[in-house]
């Protein structure tokens, strides 16, 4: 039978970490170095950090402590900036400090597509047991470099600007156009 989830899922997610002790935690949606907005497109709580501690903050501003020391892999596959360690008090370090994260990946720039995050999910989760987390990251990295070399060869020769984005828009190869990329 179908069940209805609470409008604010912050407490349920905090309890998942604290009580159920998952070995893998996957998130997506809007994030910064200081928070993860659970709902993104709808009203919900958030995960935040302070003094190296990760905590949930629900829509009533109730702070929910996260203490989940069991080792886990964290995949913020669709979260901008979750991997950017710009100072001591940031989400990546709080996940490691109070949520037991031993391995994670994370974007250091804003992203909307996230080939590396979603690709690692495919190799690591969608093909269970075939790759370790590190192997999934490496395999996906090779796939990304191959895709760039095949579809946008000029891209690999361009230096990045301060934003991490290429200075010039690279031309698409004939293979890219045949694949429907525009």
Please place each PLM-identified region on the residue numbering:
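Short, exposed beta-strand "edge-strand" segments with a Pro/Gly-rich flavor and a Y/T-containing core
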Residues: 6-7, 61, 127-130
